[in-house]
Amino acid sequence: MANLEVQEKDGEIYCPLKGKWLIAKPEEKVRQKFIATLVNEYGYTLDQMAQELELTGSKRGKGHAFADIVIWKSKADKDAMKDAFIIIETKAENVKLHVEDYYQGSNYAKFSGAEFFVSSNEIFHCSSWFYT
């Protein structure tokens, strides 16, 4: 598989998981770089991932919970709508990760049945395994 490169032009960044160009906000840049790392360094495929996926089972009241990046063990698991394997929450590079951010993301992971959670601002990464 060819390397996935982050593409930016005219204030936009290409989102391969959505198949479209988005405004290149700082958090979006971190998100797209993380997706490229997942593909290029860890061997995940785009067809086993989703971006900004609404989570069911969230206890956020009337609001909606969206996971920045979701990874399933395989495309077949994603297509069968099985529990996610990994939930990733990203923040802009200049945003310090706080314990509240970590708990928010880990709750998203638990709600979705994921086994693993990662929070990243590109500089610092936190992660947890959830044993079921």
Model-based region annotation:
Residues 1-116, 123-132:
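A short, conserved, highly charged catalytic patch centered on acidic carboxylates
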